[in-house]
Amino acid sequence: MIGFLQGKVLNLEADNVLLLVNQVGYEILLPATVVASVQNKLSDEFLNLYIYYHQTDRQPKPVLIGFDSAEEKDFFQLFITVDAIGPLKAAKAMEHSVSTIARAIENKDVAFLATLKGIGRRTAQKIVAALHGKAGRFLLAADEAGAGDGVSKTGTPSLPIQKAIDQVVDVLVQQLGHTPSAAKMMVAQALDRDPEIMTPEALFDEVYKGDVDA
């Protein structure tokens, strides 16, 4: 199974890249946001891509889909859990940043989701129904995805707990519409349930786990 490739760009098209890795050329399908990112890296010696490998009985020819970061790939894998959204459809639909799509899901913005390529209103409603409460952690991780030299860490490093608290409260207030007092209460309750939390992603997941359980 192929999970990551580093190589030299031989050719870049509107929705795919031909990547030379150890004298083998890999044709890799790219979401629109990744194409834009690759265009800015053509002068780099190597391109790094996290790979989703797709092959089924109905799709016997392997398809490789590339992402700038592990977080983008994680979001993609969450996205394709929605009924009627397969890997190829999901790749075409990811024409905005992960944080933008995740924010629309958490805000139940069906109108915006319906504008994504290949996603109509009915599918947008399915996305919200299936993923609301699950996409919030990508609001926190997406700002770091693809930063710097394009090589993302395989996991998010632990941050001092106060920084994690501040970051989660900011997302709850600024992006999801909670009042500051309500956001702080939600975070405090999450930490009561799991005092060992040290990362903003884990804290956000626990906040919404409590919200769903309630």
Curated annotation (Swiss-Prot):
Subcellular localization, as worded in the UniProt entry: Cytoplasm
One Pfam entry name: HHH_5
Main location: cytoplasm
Record-linked InterPro entries: DNA_helicase_Holl-junc_RuvA_I, NA-bd_OB-fold, RuvA, RuvA_2-like
Keyword Ribosomal protein carried by entry: no
Keywords: Cytoplasm, DNA damage, DNA recombination, DNA repair, DNA-binding
Region Domain III, residue ranges: 161-214
Region listing for Domain I, in residue ranges: 1-68
Flexible linker: annotated span: 147-160
Region (Domain II): 69-146
BP-aspect Gene Ontology terms: DNA recombination; DNA repair
Family classification: Belongs to the RuvA family.
Quaternary structure annotation from Swiss-Prot or TrEMBL: Homotetramer. Forms an RuvA(8)-RuvB(12)-Holliday junction (HJ) complex. HJ DNA is sandwiched between 2 RuvA tetramers; dsDNA enters through RuvA and exits via RuvB. An RuvB hexamer assembles on each DNA strand where it exits the tetramer. Each RuvB hexamer is contacted by two RuvA subunits (via domain III) on 2 adjacent RuvB subunits; this complex drives branch migration. In the full resolvosome a probable DNA-RuvA(4)-RuvB(12)-RuvC(2) complex forms which resolves the HJ.
Role summary: The RuvA-RuvB-RuvC complex processes Holliday junction (HJ) DNA during genetic recombination and DNA repair, while the RuvA-RuvB complex plays an important role in the rescue of blocked DNA replication forks via replication fork reversal (RFR). RuvA specifically binds to HJ cruciform DNA, conferring on it an open structure. The RuvB hexamer acts as an ATP-dependent pump, pulling dsDNA into and through the RuvAB complex. HJ branch migration allows RuvC to scan DNA until it finds its consensus sequence, where it cleaves and resolves the cruciform DNA.
Protein name: Holliday junction branch migration complex subunit RuvA
